[in-house]
Amino acid sequence: MSTTGLSEFLPSFSGLYLDKEILMINKALNIGDGKRLGIIGGSKISTKLKVLENLTEKLDILFVGGGMANTFLLAKGYKIGKSLCEKTMLETAVNILETAKNKNCKLILPVDALIANDMEKGTSFSEVMIDEVPDDALILDIGPKTIEVINSFLSTVSTAVWCGPLGLFELNPFQTGTVSVAKEISKLTKEEKLVSVAGGGDTVAALSQSNYNKDFTYISTAGGAFLELLAGENLPGIEVLKK
């Protein structure tokens, strides 16, 4: 009601920020030539399921990082130690991998990781290949080889859409993956080689921490609504303006 009620009594129009939000997301996913790449992070598949399903149909390349990558890795038979994982979503992860393949969307997972035995400040960490994660370890960030993989793909696309941090960015040094990729996107955007769109609460916080957010083409302030737009859903506040 909060986004639709006023329009029942008064003439209503979208504001400049809403116009730009819709324009930039539509441009990133639907308009123009060139390949499109998505970066999806965060902790859970369940919170971004519809986003993942929609993006496999819209994008040429989709990188999955953050905690949700662990569920995909486990679904593919990798050991993930004590890492965050949604075991109830394993079948869903397999289905998304299959859908991406059928839609010719290249879905990429981490090839290495930064691991630790706990999430305490100052904890010791190490770099391992993704098939070498010990049983007592936590995957807390993507590793340097994965950063290289993402950056190499970024150089081949015209548009990048980002939603969700790639590691436990609140704890040093597990912000490294997020900051490194943000730096590369910033560089390519400034060189006018890339249109870059990012959004989602944690994403905005992580990018602000990296100080590279100012160079992105567009940073969404819509929070959860950004996810809904990425998922291809109709938002009540927008639909009512079409009447």
PLM region spans:
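Active-site loop-to-helix "anion-binding N-cap" substructures in soluble metabolic enzymes
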Residues: M1-K243
